[in-house]
Amino acid sequence: MAISLQKSTVVKVVGVSLVMLLAACSTDQRYKRQVSGDESYLTAPGLKPLNAPSGMILPVQNGEFDVRTVNSQGAVGKQLDIRPPVQPLTLLSGSRAENATDTSKLLLENSPQNRDLWAQVTRVLQDHNWPIASRQDASQTLTTDWIKWNRADEDVQFEGRYQISVQEQGYQLALVVKSLELQQGGKTITQYSEIQRYNSAMLNAIIEGLDKVRADSESSQASRKVGTLDVQSGSDDTGLPLLIVRAPYAVVWERLPAALEKVGMKVTDRSRPQGTVSVTSKSLSSSSWDALGAKDPELPEGDYKLQVGDLDNRSSLQFIGPKGHTLTQAQNDALVAVFQAAFSQTSATAIK
């Protein structure tokens, strides 16, 4: 009985220790920021001058092979943050980003598409429930209150205040995010890399929100548009065959899944920013083709990739077959009448 009790106690102690160890591991996120491996290089002896024995003739010294002593200052070993800089998202057409010490800037074309940029930016902040300390619509500038970040690679989370503005710069519009103050655990952070990391994180969050706002608007407009879309055969810059649809990208994107379903192609995955659609094609019965009013293109069954291109007021559709090759010219031409009929019998889809 005493032995059994002792074993039970040992099991409980081991169990509690294991739980505590796992809990500690689950909250310690340093492994995501630190280099792993041997750190013996930190204690390696420094370089010393070569002392040749008396009478030995050494080769002529060549400066190209000198290993110079460099007194560098900065974090080393476990103190070195190995995370790469946050890169700006390229979700908005024609955009490019610039970074300075405490400022991240997104440059966009000063076009009708970006006419309502300021209103869209303020909507994104409201959708995120981010606190706004002050706002001046006349100058298109606002200042946020403290925004708390929640990153899985930080033990102690950061919070920051930002100034966000939209500025006209000639033929461009600039969306500017400026860091006013960054804190971690109540302590002010002045390290450039951290300020830039969270500045870029703020800019990317706004970019994602803008992309969603615009996608929702385009989807709403496309869902109200029905009717026949003109489809023609064409080719890309390298001469490979594709389909040309005389409708904007947003309209084609929303109506495409239903049209694909109509011709026996089931959508398995799609990405609007990349314009890619994955489908699985299965043969239809002759009665289905008769109902569609088109001739069977006789495509082999299997998985296809579809690349959707944005050509302003037109769109392109290029199919890549199961073996990784584009369709032949004959196969592509056969799909013209097929998709002409499919688009005429379908409207926008609810698939996202």
From Swiss-Prot:
Its main location: membrane. Residues 1-24 form the signal peptide. Coiled coil: none annotated. A lipid is attached at C25 (N-palmitoyl cysteine). InterPro entries: BamC (IPR014524), BamC_C (IPR042268), NlpB/DapX (IPR010653). A lipid is attached at C25 (S-diacylglycerol cysteine). It is found in: Cell outer membrane. Keywords: Cell outer membrane, Lipoprotein, Membrane, Palmitate, Signal. GO terms for cellular component: cell outer membrane. It is a lipid-anchor. GO terms for biological process: Gram-negative-bacterium-type cell outer membrane assembly; protein insertion into membrane. Gene3D superfamilies: 3.30.530.50, Outer membrane protein assembly factor BamC (3.30.310.170). It holds the Pfam family Lipoprotein_18. Part of the outer membrane protein assembly complex, which is involved in assembly and insertion of beta-barrel proteins into the outer membrane. Belongs to the BamC family. Part of the Bam complex, which is composed of the outer membrane protein BamA, and four lipoproteins BamB, BamC, BamD and BamE. This is Outer membrane protein assembly factor BamC. It comes from Yersinia pestis.
